[in-house]
């Protein structure tokens, strides 16, 4: 595991996390190599790495929920989920520098990221 910091950028959907992602990306922070393409609802882009979004979506689906309604029930992450998180982090660490991840869904999984990344984790919460 790398010692480089990891910036976790998250906030509620439509809270300007993409605008912050845009600023950070333009400043040189690597937010992923497979960013979701711009769309009419977000013309400059989402700055979300598709593998991370897919991973988070699968975790939600396996907990019988989605990003639109998570409810107040606990999200249970299995060893398989943690293994996929470790694999994602290892892949991103391979770039050899600090990197970031942006996904509103990530706010539901902060304890898992904090536990795995430890002191490397840096958090930027966007509230609007």
Where is each model-derived feature located?
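Generic structural signal for well-ordered alpha-helices
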Residues: 85-86, 110
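Catalytic phosphate/metal-binding cores of nucleic-acid and nucleotide-processing enzymes, i.e., regions
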Residues: 5, 77, 90-97, 116-117, ...
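PAPS-dependent sulfotransferase catalytic core
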Residues: 1-83
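Charged/polar, solvent-exposed surface patches and flexible loops
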Residues: 54-58, 87, 91, 115
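Surface-exposed cleft-lining segments at the edges of enzyme active sites
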Residues: 72-74, 95-104
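Conserved phosphate-donor/acceptor-positioning beta-strand/loop module used by diverse small-molecule
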Residues: 102-104, 113-128
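Short, well-ordered alpha-helical microsegments
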Residues: 17, 107-111
């Amino acid at each position: 595991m790398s010692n480089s910091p990891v910036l976790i950028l998250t906030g509620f959907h439509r809270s300007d996390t993409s605008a912050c992602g845009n600023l950070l990306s333009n400043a040189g922070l690597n937010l992923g190599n497979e960013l979701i393409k711009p769309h009419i609802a977000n013309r400059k882009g989402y700055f979300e790495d598709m593998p991370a979004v897919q991973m988070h979506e699968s975790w939600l689906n396996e907990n019988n929920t989605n990003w639109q309604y998570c409810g107040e029930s606990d999200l249970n992450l299995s060893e398989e989920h943690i293994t996929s998180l470790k694999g994602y982090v290892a892949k991103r660490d391979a770039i050899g520098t600090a990197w970031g991840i942006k996904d509103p869904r990530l706010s539901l999984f902060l304890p898992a990221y904090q536990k795995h990344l430890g002191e490397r984790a840096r958090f930027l919460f966007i509230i609007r």
